[in-house]
Amino acid sequence: MASKFDLHSLVANWQNSSATAKAHWSGTFDEYLDIVKANPKVTRNAYQRMFDMIVEEGTEVYIDFKKEVVRYKFFDDKFNNGKDAVFGLDVQLMKLVNVLKAAALGYGTEKRVILLHGPVGSAKSTICRMLKKGLERYSYSDTGALYTFEWVDEKLELDGLLGKGVKVFPTPMNEEPLLLIPDDLRASVFEQLNKGQEGTYRVNVDGELSPPSRYIFKALMEKYDGDLMRVFKHVRVKRLFLSEADRVGIGTFQPKDEKNQDSTELTGDINYRKIAEYGSDSDPRAFNFDGEFNIANRGLIEFVEVLKLDVAFLYDLLGASQEHRVKPKKFAQTHIDEVIIGHTNEPEYRRLQDNEFMEALRDRTVKIDIPYITRWRDEVNIYKRDFNSQKVRGISIAPHTVEMAAMWAILTRLEKPKKANLTRLQKLKLYNGKTLPNYTEDNVRELRKETQREGLEGISARYIQDKLSNALVAAQQSNKGSVNPFMVFKELESGLKSHSLISDEEVKAEYRELLGVVMQEYEEIIKAEVQRAISADESAMQRLCGNYIDNVKAYTQKERVRNQFTGNDEEPDERLMRSIEEKIEIPESRKDDFRREIMNYIGALALEGKKFNYKMNERLHKAIELKLFEDQKDSIKLTTLVSNVADKDTQEKIDVVKTRLIKDFGYDEISATDVLHYVASIFARGDVKSK
């Protein structure tokens, strides 16, 4: 019999944990000063805290086409199992973190709006969501701890200063407790707190209290004849935990119909119920400081589609960024400490550039382009996260299905190369790290530099995800058991007819043409895999390669070759060498160059104490495979699959090939059978050679 679920012990352990105890810590102002003295980082401003949050997750430095790139592991989203992980934007994220670093050090970017700019579906919202979730998590950690305060009147001795019958009045904008120290006293207090400190950040809190706290502070100072220590007796400091759901330290603002939206959503509004209690609509206690700017204090405010906002809101944004102040109705400018980040799509940004009245906003923004991914393997990672065997149950996804969809997406985003002899597909492969003849890393860097808008146009990842989902559902409904690239190609093409963001018929025609390029590439891939499965006899390949190398060595050194069977010395077998070289289109005029290249490569390996293997040379490897395939394909009679007439011996050989496809290339029974039938139809047409 299964044991009962013991919730009580789990709750007891949770409540007794040190983390829970720290989470509910509260103390006096003096106790808080001791905390600050021991750890000045608790007083960091919003930019400093966000920068540290990202960096503390770790970094990885790598070289991308001779350029050093820092990858910030924070954006791997490991705490959420990679659900929001950002792929392929390391350079752009590095720029974002550099902006945050400059702001953290007070170099000026803390007075700017960070504007993420890019096409729809390019991860702008995802980046903001990760920053918000990260701040929530960080505020619960020891390294990310921050504090605020509340006013207390346990004995109700303040004559309703905090409100009728109110014993606890939380400061509405989550201010830093050190703001309670009067301006003319701060320098000496901070000097004492910073004595002996050698860290990056020193205690240097800027700003002032929110209007309600300033009102209460002044009233208490008057009541106690300026005795600050007695005022502090009514202050209780507590840990502050940021939460978007609870509207604490994290705010989100998005445009709506301008008739139903006004600036009070940003800066708060009068609490008419409280006016009767306090007698005036200008009493700060009768005002709800719950606008997005107010509640986001100490953290982050995200402006969704920021450039769609009415101009009236943009004035609030200008003051908030440059001066770190907002103007609630009937109150003085109020200090805020928060990261201001917005994002926008291309059409709205062009409007900003064309509008002379928006010049002030342009001057106060730091634009960071967040384009579509242009590296194939990164795009594949996006789809593998959602379309894998763990998430997709009851139906298989054939090898290359996701990869081919990703390839098409990348091709639509790449600009046509200016070099006439370079195709977009070759450009994609170069960006993906593949080497091509006559192209160095410097050439690839030049390719990137010559582009104007690469990654800012094309098909979004969302469209691909939608069509992959459609193909999966259609396959499940028809009981096909497996989704293959051709099913996805069909969905991708049919979806173009009604694509909401592409109205230009020429662009649609171009994208269809690129889909044809991807289909051709897929055919080449599966032809090569079937050929390799047929010629997958490792010992036969090694024998053939050894025979070829022996003959090439003799040819280049003008020697004879010992015949293994007769023992006689013979001339190099020109027919054998050419039958292999022709498979990779080495012309007669270049055979000597190719053979010398192979021998030089083998010689260079020998100097390093390494032994040559045919797999080390991609072109020779391919040639050996194709030669062996040609020698064996007639015995397997793959084309009998087309006519569905195969004798027992042939079927057994075909089953061996299918088993190799499953074992070596990741196919299952259904997809392996489908691929064999399709490749057999290609071979039946006589199209055997792989490019």
Regions found by a protein language model. Give the residues of each.
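N-terminal accessory segments that target, anchor, or regulate ATP-driven/P-loop NTPase machines
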Residues: M1-E57, G118-G121
